[in-house]
Amino acid sequence: MIKVYNTLNKKKEEFIPLTPGEVKMYVCGPTVYNFFHIGNGRTFIVFDTIRRYFEYRGFKVDFVQNFTDIDDKMIKKANEEGTTVKKIGDTYIKEYYQDADALNIERATVNPRATEFIGEIIKFVKGLVDKGYAYEVDGDVYFSTKKFEGYGKLSGQNIEDLQSGARISVDERKKDPMDFAIWKAQKPGEPAWNSPWGMGRPGWHIECSCMAKKLLGETIDIHAGGSDLKFPHHENEIAQSEALTGEPFARYWLHSAFVNVNNEKMSKSLNNFFTAREILERYDADVIRFLMLSAHYRQQLNFSEDLLESAKASVERIYNAIGNLENLIDEVSREEMNEEEKAYLESLNKYKEKYIEKMDDDFNTADAITAIFDLIKDTNTNITIDSSKELAQKALELIRELGAPLGMFQKSTKGNLEEEIEALIAKRQQARKDRDFALADKIRDELKDRGIVLEDTPQGVRWKMI
């Protein structure tokens, strides 16, 4: 049984899909006017992992993640660069895929662009106007929040409190300060489409509501995104979607926490961000994913070079174990397991059970990773040159099986690990000859930190995993 923390009801709930064995999941994607930063990247990695885990548990997942390709920021960027909004969108959608692929983020079932749904959006807006939930002023169309009972139920705020909130724009033409634009009249220099209210473009909130409804249906299983989208974006999506259809919009709402730098939220507006591409130039995707999944997805994560280095060392420990098993598979002479080994292999299932228990509990990736470390500690100790090829192979398959939903630990180290260690040993031997004992000790300690111990023997230096 999978339990998820439902932001809507402020508690963990058993996940029961609308259709048995299927998950309809919508995740708010990027506004494509720039490269995405690692704070956005955490959101994409988290929900990629959750999608993978549902699939691991046997669900068929329809996973939709949109591109916002018409927006104030995109218009500003296009005007600054003397190009069109479409060209800006085309460019940064391509760049998104490059970076997301590099982070081993699986492609969505569908990545809709808002501009591909203008006709559907106009129908959606007209439906709200016809039902009395929206009104037109000078070519702009606003959603009337007071008409929708329960506005504020996601963010847990009442409408009176929200009216004085700092994020609400003041416009005297609106009937209420809380009302928000679902269609915007054209301004000079802006792209626009013909509508019953004149030339204009959609508001941001209406885009996701429309795409989710069109691609997944009136009620979906999971709507997800960063916690900064809870209000007003997701609150407004609920209001306009449920006002139009009369049905619950999403049964479960999942939100990932911020990535912070110096205890401040990472954001482009604060100029304290690092793009995913910048980090990928220096660290492997497994390292970045490890860091992003090393804390529970609802827990804020501080981003620093030290934490990246720590994640790198942790990933290396796991790949050292993988490399050790790969080498044993090549080196051991006995093919099949004996009865004792079969019993030992069966005992390793306790780590898989612990992993599933933790992931079933609102996708606790941090504790699931701990289960993988416990597994490799066991295999490093008990699978040796005297073991069978079959046992080493089965243990390796189990490590990879548990790593797959996390999007990690799938690469082969064959040849690379041994060559790297032998090169470091040779460097250490030369340092000792040169009487540079500080360097020799540093190399020994570095190898030890990676789970490799050196033994000086009459035949030379040997190494083994611990």
UniProtKB/Swiss-Prot annotation:
Recorded hits in SMART domains, A to Z, give: DALR_2
What is any one GO biological process for this UniProt entry? cysteinyl-tRNA aminoacylation
Which GO CC annotations does the UniProt entry carry? cytosol
Q: Which UniProt keywords apply?
A: Aminoacyl-tRNA synthetase, ATP-binding, Cytoplasm, Ligase, Metal-binding, Nucleotide-binding, Protein biosynthesis, Zinc
Looking up SUPFAM superfamilies in the UniProt record yields: Anticodon-binding domain of a subclass of class I aminoacyl-tRNA synthetases, Nucleotidylyl transferase
- What do we know about how this protein assembles, alone or with others? Monomer.
Q: What is this protein called?
A: Cysteine--tRNA ligase
